[in-house]
Amino acid sequence: MVVANDDVSSAKRSESNNTGVSQISKQEIREKFKSFYTREWGQTQPCRETSLHKFGVCSNVLRNEGNAPFMLSRGPVEGGVSKVAVLFHGLSDSPFFMREIADILFDEGYTVIVPLLPGHGKRDATSDMSDWDLAERWQAHVAEVIALADEMGDELIVGGFSTGGALAVEHYLNSANNIDGLMLFSGALALSENAEGMSRIWGIKLLARIIDGTYQTHGPNPYKYPNVAGLAGLELMDIINAIREKIDEGSQIQVPLFVAHSKDDATTPISGVEHLLAHSNASNTFFVVDESYELCHADLVVNDKLLNAMNFNESMLTQQEDCAIPKSNPLFSTMAFMLRAFVN
């Protein structure tokens, strides 16, 4: 394990932008959050799983409640200061995979929002995963969730896993004013050489759409699609290219940045986040899991608790790849310690 820590500091909004807690009530926040998904799915319903601090939005269109978007909140913070965090999940994933990171931030006093990106967590996602405007739908949802989060307090940190991290960075580079810190877990700022090469082939999106056909959502993991749709992967590449263009034009990251990544990540090579860090002017924390741990891309945010709750069905595997069976990150507790230091 290698940990590079560059003057870790909390992600605080400048005093000039500190307007205190918005007057929006907890009920208004929940209704607005729910309205995003009523519009997207057509109908929502209360989740059966309830807890004192958790508010989820469920629907019959979802595979199960573990795929549902949720919020963690305690209510107004004494002294009129509220901290809000937004965590976006990865491509083919669901909010389930953000649970443990969300709990860490909640324990540190944050209200945490974990949205569900369009096209994810559903029983039937064929029309979504063949949508030419899927990336634009992701971006629009990211924007509306962050706008809601900005109403809720005077400190806002945003990030996510893989594609979720890329979407957070892309939004920051286009609308930086209300974001005070970024968090990337296996951030998808580069893809494998093969994937990036394929994305440059003329007409590849049409071909991918044809090959994808009827998209399979049911598989061994109840909270993750069994495969990434080809067209959706190319939509992600568009997001990555947009980030690179912004950086090439001279854009810089001006807020504290937390980055956690495995050197053995073959899905999103670590070079992508290293390039971003090279264009940052803030205090950063870079947590690197050494190659000797052989930690796969998706396993970075998995601890023993999440793995046990996953109920992964190995008997349904159709292929035996090195990273096909989820494992817990042996350095998760150390990563969590570094994240806590970052936000304090």
Where are these regions (language model features)?
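Active-site nucleophile loop of the alpha/beta-hydrolase fold
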Residues: 183-194
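Short beta-strand/loop motif that positions the catalytic acidic residue
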Residues: 253, 259-261, 265
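Gly/Ala-rich beta-loop-alpha elbow adjacent to hydrolase catalytic centers
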Residues: 159-168
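Short, surface-exposed "cap/lid" segments of acyl-processing enzymes
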Residues: 65-120
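Catalytic active-site module of serine/aspartate enzymes centered on a nucleophile-bearing elbow/loop
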Residues: 296-344
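Catalytic nucleophile-loop/oxyanion-hole region of alpha/beta-hydrolase
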Residues: 123-152
